[in-house]
UniProtKB/Swiss-Prot annotation:
GO term, biological process aspect, one: proteasome-mediated ubiquitin-dependent protein catabolic process
Positions of disulphide bridges: none
Keywords of the record: ATP-binding, Cytoplasm, Nucleotide-binding, Nucleus, Proteasome
Role of this protein: The 26S proteasome is involved in the ATP-dependent degradation of ubiquitinated proteins. The regulatory (or ATPase) complex confers ATP dependency and substrate specificity to the 26S complex.
Cross-referenced Gene3D superfamilies: 1.10.8.60, Nucleic acid-binding proteins, P-loop containing nucleotide triphosphate hydrolases
Protein family (similarity comment): Belongs to the AAA ATPase family.
Residues that hold ATP according to the record: 186-193
Record lineage: Eukaryota, Fungi, Dikarya, Ascomycota, Taphrinomycotina
Protein species of origin: Schizosaccharomyces pombe (strain 972 / ATCC 24843)
Cellular component terms (Gene Ontology): cytosol; nuclear envelope; nucleus; proteasome regulatory particle, base subcomplex
UniProt name for this protein: 26S proteasome regulatory subunit 8 homolog
Gene: let1
C-alpha cells in the first residue's frame, strides 16, 4: 500500500514538472514573439521618423524664398562679381563666405538671393540632352594603321590637331597661335570620318560627333542654342574634338533671295557657329574638325583663316592606295595563298575606300555561301563585279519590274 502511494506521488510530481515546463516554454516563445514584434515596430518607427524629417526639410525648402539665376561675366576684386541676370540686367554682387572665389569663372551659372542678390551657389551648366547624346563616351578605337593611302593627309592633320594638344609649348616658343579647326573635303567614302576618329584615339580626347542636319531645327533659335551648348559641353570635357559631319547642310553660302523661314533659321545657326569659332581660344584644347563633300557651296566666311586654319583634300585613292586599303581590310581574313590584291585594286579604278571595304565583306560572303572557311581569288573577283556593278543591277531589276 505504501509503495502504491509513493508511486502515485512520483507520477503526480512528474506531471506537475511537465506542466510547468510546458508553461515556461510557452511563455518564452511568447516573449520571443513579442520581442520580434517590438523590434519590427521600432524599425517601422525609425523609418517613419526619417520620412517625417525629409518631409519637414522639403517643406522648409519650399517655404524658403526663391533665387535668381545669373551668368558670371567677370570677377571684381576679392569678394565682388559682375553678374548678368536675365531680363533685369547686370549687377555687381557680393559672394557668400562659403564659396571660394577661385571656383567662380566667366560664363558659369550661379544662384543669387532674391532679397540681397548675394551669390550663394554655383550651378551646373545647362546642356540639352540631345547635345549630351552627341558625345561618344568611349574613346574611338580607330588608329592610323587602319587608314590606308592617306599618308599626306595624316601628316597634315597631325600638325593641326595632335601636335597642339600634346605639345602646346612648341607653338608658344615660336610665337604663333594654335590652329582652331580644319576642314576635310572629298568624295564620300574616302576616309574623312575614319581619320577623325583615329585622331581622337591618338590624342586621348573626348570625341563629340554631330551631323550638320541635327542642328537644323524647326523652331527659331533652337539650332543656335544647340551650337552654344555643344561648345559649352566641349569646354567642360576638354581636351575634346568636335567632329561636324555634313557641314554643308548649315554652312552653305548665304544669298539675298528669301527662301522662307527655314533658310533664315539655317543662316542663324551658321552665324552662331561662326560666333563660337571666333569666341573660343585654341589654347583650351578644343579642336573642331569639319567634313563635307560639297566644298563648292560653303560660305566664304566659314572658310577664312582663323576659323578654318587648314583645308585637307581627300581624293579618290590611287592604285597603290587601293591595294593598301585592301590589305588593311583583309588583314584579319582567312585568305588562301596566291591572292593578288594588287590586280584586284587595279580593276577598281575610281573606287572609294568604303567600296574597297565592301569588296572584302562581299568576298567573305561568297565564301560563306559555299560553306568554306577561306577566301579565294575568285571570291574577290566576284565581289568586285558585284560592288562595281551594283547600280547596273539595280537598273536592270527596275526594268524587269515595270515590264
Amino acid at each position: 500500500m505504501t509503495e502504491v502511494l509513493k508511486t502515485n506521488v512520483l507520477q503526480s510530481n512528474e506531471n506537475i514538472v511537465q506542466y510547468y515546463t510546458q508553461k515556461i516554454q510557452d511563455a518564452e516563445l511568447a516573449i520571443l514573439q513579442k520581442t520580434q514584434n517590438l523590434r519590427r515596430l521600432e524599425a517601422q518607427r525609425n523609418g517613419l521618423n526619417a520620412r517625417v524629417r525629409l518631409l519637414r526639410e522639403e517643406i522648409q525648402l519650399l517655404q524658403e524664398p526663391g533665387s535668381y539665376v545669373g551668368e558670371v561675366i567677370k570677377t571684381m576684386g576679392k569678394n565682388k562679381v559682375l553678374v548678368k541676370v536675365h531680363p533685369e540686367g547686370k549687377y555687381v554682387v557680393d559672394i557668400s563666405p562659403d564659396i571660394d572665389i577661385k571656383e567662380i569663372k566667366p560664363n558659369i551659372r550661379v544662384a543669387l538671393r532674391n532679397d540681397s542678390y548675394q551669390l550663394i551657389k554655383i550651378l551646373p551648366n545647362k546642356v540639352d540632352p540631345l547635345v549630351s547624346l552627341m558625345m561618344v563616351e568611349k574613346i574611338p578605337d580607330s588608329t592610323y594603321e587602319m587608314v590606308g593611302g592617306l599618308e599626306k593627309q595624316i601628316k597634315e592633320i597631325k600638325e593641326v590637331i595632335e601636335l597642339p594638344v600634346k605639345h602646346p609649348e612648341l607653338f608658344e616658343s615660336l610665337g604663333i597661335p594654335q590652329p582652331k579647326g580644319i576642314l576635310l573635303y572629298g568624295p564620300p567614302g574616302t576616309g574623312k570620318t575614319l581619320l577623325a576618329r583615329a585622331v581622337a584615339h591618338h590624342t586621348d580626347c573626348k570625341f563629340i560627333r554631330v551631323s550638320g542636319s541635327e542642328l537644323v531645327q524647326k523652331y527659331i533659335g533652337e539650332g543656335s542654342r544647340m551650337v552654344r551648348e555643344l561648345f559649352v559641353m566641349a569646354r567642360e570635357h576638354a581636351p575634346s574634338i568636335i567632329f561636324m559631319d555634313e557641314i554643308d547642310s548649315i554652312g552653305s553660302s548665304r544669298s539675298d533671295s528669301s527662301g522662307g523661314s527655314g533658310d533664315s533659321e539655317v543662316q542663324r545657326t551658321m552665324l552662331e557657329l561662326l560666333n563660337q569659332l571666333d569666341g573660343f581660344e585654341a589654347t583650351k584644347n578644343i579642336k573642331v574638325i569639319m567634313a563635307t563633300n560639297r566644298i563648292d557651296i560653303l560660305d566664304p566666311a566659314l572658310l577664312r583663316p582663323g576659323r578654318i586654319d587648314r583645308k585637307i583634300e581627300f581624293p579618290p585613292p590611287s592604285a597603290e592606295a587601293r591595294a593598301e586599303i585592301l590589305r588593311i581590310h583583309s588583314r584579319s581574313m582567312n585568305l588562301t595563298r596566291g591572292i593578288d590584291l594588287k590586280s584586284i585594286a587595279e580593276k577598281m579604278n575610281g573606287a572609294s575606300g568604303a567600296e574597297l571595304k565592301g569588296v572584302c565583306t562581299e568576298a567573305g560572303m561568297f565564301a560563306l555561301r559555299e560553306r568554306r572557311v577561306h577566301v579565294t581569288q575568285e571570291d574577290f573577283e566576284l565581289a568586285v563585279a558585284k560592288v562595281l556593278n551594283k547600280g547596273d543591277s539595280g537598273e536592270m531589276s527596275l526594268q524587269k519590274l515595270f515590264k
